Regions:
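Short coil-to-helix segment of the ABC ATPase nucleotide-binding domain corresponding to the Q-loop/switch region
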Residues: 91-98
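Catalytic Walker B motif of ABC-type/P-loop ATPase nucleotide-binding domains
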Residues: 156-159
Length: 255
């Protein structure tokens, strides 16, 4: 059974000028432990879809079915990672990581120990008393991810998480984030405009059409070298094959 089912979801916005269809008859499943990327033209409704999955938006019709009771009964089991890290500059790294636990009133001894363990596991312990302004952009994104993981989500929603980083930093951070999500055994859904990023991070890539968004293609991503990091996947022969395939799909959508 799939962890999550998107079942014939439609989203309409109503303004004084009339109704606008944002999403139309969207259906797909997400398996436990899967990393799924969603790509498509700007403004096609990718972020809207993430907000529907997270429960922040109610679809006009259709259903999001959470087959895990832990998620169904507690949508806090979904964690968000945004384009910006949203770290508070006056708090230390550790205080930023613990902030979500504090806000949700679950700052227990066990959860604090888990947060400290995450900081240590991902080489941030020695920076725990630093302020965010003392860190590189890549390290700040790692802190933002650890802050999300400290809440122990079952599903991670990533909305253009690397777009604010320069190219070189981006390559390093994609490796870091991929490894962390893999080691923690999380299910992840990422929205991105970067085809290469989608290929190297994902097991599947869904291509959306222009608004109203429907599914144009659902591509399984398989690399022969299963141990390749995202950075190394760019050098594998399958990368160019998938890039060409997805480029044609996107080019067809934009054409």
């Amino acid at each position: 059974m799939s962890l999550l089912e998107i079942n014939d979801v439609n989203m309409n916005y109503h303004t004084k000028n009339g109704a606008t269809e944002a999403i139309k008859h969207l259906s797909f499943n997400i398996e436990e432990g899967e990393f799924l990327s969603i790509i498509g033209p700007s403004g096609c409704g990718k972020s809207t879809l993430l907000n529907i999955i997270s429960g922040l938006l109610e679809p006009s019709s259709g259903k999001v079915i959470y087959n895990d009771p832990e998620v169904k009964n507690n949508l806090d089991k979904m964690g968000y990672m945004f384009q910006k890290d949203y770290l508070f500059p006056w708090l230390t790294v550790r205080e930023n990581v613990l902030l979500g636990l504090k806000i949700k009133n679950i700052l227990t001894e066990e959860n604090i120990k888990n947060a400290d363990k995450l900081l240590k596991s991902y080489d941030l312990e020695k920076f725990k008393d630093h302020k965010p302004t003392q860190l590189s952009g890549g390290m700040r994104q790692r802190v933002a991810l650890i802050r999300t993981l400290a809440l122990n989500p079952r599903i991670l929603l990533l909305d253009e998480p690397f777009s604010a980083l320069d190219y070189q930093t981006r390559q390093k951070v994609t490796d870091d984030v991929y490894e962390i999500i893999k080691r923690e055994g999380k299910t992840a859904i990422m929205v991105t405009h970067d085809l290469g990023e989608a290929i190297i991070m994902s097991k599947r890539v869904i291509v959306l059409t222009k608004r109203p968004a429907t599914i144009k293609d659902d591509v399984e991503i398989v690399f022969a070298n299963k141990d390749a990091t995202p950075f190394k996947k760019r050098q594998e022969p399958e990368f160019n094959k998938y890039f060409g395939e997805l480029w044609k799909e996107i080019d067809g959508v934009n054409g």
